[in-house]
Design a protein with these regions (language model features):
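Hydrophobic beta-sheet segments that form the core/acyl-binding groove
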Residues: 82-114
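Hot-dog-fold acyl-thioester-processing enzymes
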Residues: 1-82
């Protein structure tokens, strides 16, 4: 399967432009991310343990969400000319397997000096 990133230039994007991704979080994604990252913390991979410490189920890795953000930036907005230099994330609520999650990105400012 080929993946095609949008080829937006700075002239193609404007403040207020947005992109959105909604996905169904799967156990397979969580397992694959644990393998890729090496993060096998039982909060992420052991539902019984996560439940025993107060969560409804195993908790999705925060950086799995961050990876989805990276994919949205690099593939859609702005696309292949994007280089992510800084990212600040907060997780006010846990995300669990089988949840539907939506990420929405919006351009708030454009810096032409890069």
């Amino acid at each position: 399967m080929k993946h095609h990133a949008k080829d937006n230039t700075i002239a193609d994007v404007a403040v207020g432009d947005s992109a959105e991704l909604t996905w169904h979080v799967t156990h397979e994604e969580i397992s694959a991310f644990a393998a890729l990252s090496g993060d096998y913390n039982p909060l992420h991979v052991d539902p019984k343990y996560a439940f025993s410490v107060g969560f409804n189920a195993q908790v999705v890795h925060g950086f799995l969400v961050g990876a989805k953000i990276s994919g949205l930036l690099g593939m859609q907005l702005p696309g292949r000319r994007c280089l992510l230099l800084d990212q600040s994330l907060s997780y006010p609520n846990p995300l669990y397997p089988d949840d539907r999650a939506t990420i929405r990105l919006e351009i708030q400012s454009i810096h032409e000096d890069m």
